[in-house]
């Protein structure tokens, strides 16, 4: 009886470890924040260049940033979201714009 109980305990422990190991990664929203200085055309360029939106969808998102103060550009794993935000912020600074890209847990 002890061996069966031990095997069941080991099997249960292994199942719990597998459940923990295959937990989906945390996801993060990549958000553009409005400012009074960055040209609308530059925001559209950013949305096309870094998020692969066509000009129509990029324009819609740019208008959301402009009128609502911010817009979610996409939802990604932490590493991808952070990389996109860093690239957008660097590109904005290189072009002397104060555009800000942030992350928020989804």
UniProtKB/Swiss-Prot annotation:
Under the heading InterPro entries, the entry gives: ClpS, ClpS_core, Ribosomal_bL12_C/ClpS-like
* Example GO BP: protein catabolic process
Q: Which residues cross the membrane?
A: none
Q: Which family does it belong to?
A: Belongs to the ClpS family.
NCBIfam families associated with the record: PRK00033.1-3, PRK00033.1-5
Quaternary state and interactors = Binds to the N-terminal domain of the chaperone ClpA.
Q: What does it do?
A: Involved in the modulation of the specificity of the ClpAP-mediated ATP-dependent protein degradation.
HAMAP family, per the entry: ClpS
Protein's name according to its UniProt entry: ATP-dependent Clp protease adapter protein ClpS
């Amino acid at each position: 009886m002890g061996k069966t109980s031990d095997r069941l305990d080991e099997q249960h422990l292994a199942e719990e470890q597998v459940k923990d190991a295959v937990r989906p990664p945390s996801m993060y929203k990549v958000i553009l924040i409005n400012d009074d200085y960055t040209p609308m055309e530059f925001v559209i360029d950013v949305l096309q260049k870094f998020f692969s939106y066509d000009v129509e969808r990029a324009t819609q998102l740019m208008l959301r940033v402009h009128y609502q103060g911010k817009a979610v550009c996409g939802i990604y794993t932490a590493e991808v979201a952070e990389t996109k935000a860093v690239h957008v912020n660097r590109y904005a600074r290189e072009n002397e714009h104060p555009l800000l890209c942030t992350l928020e847990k989804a």
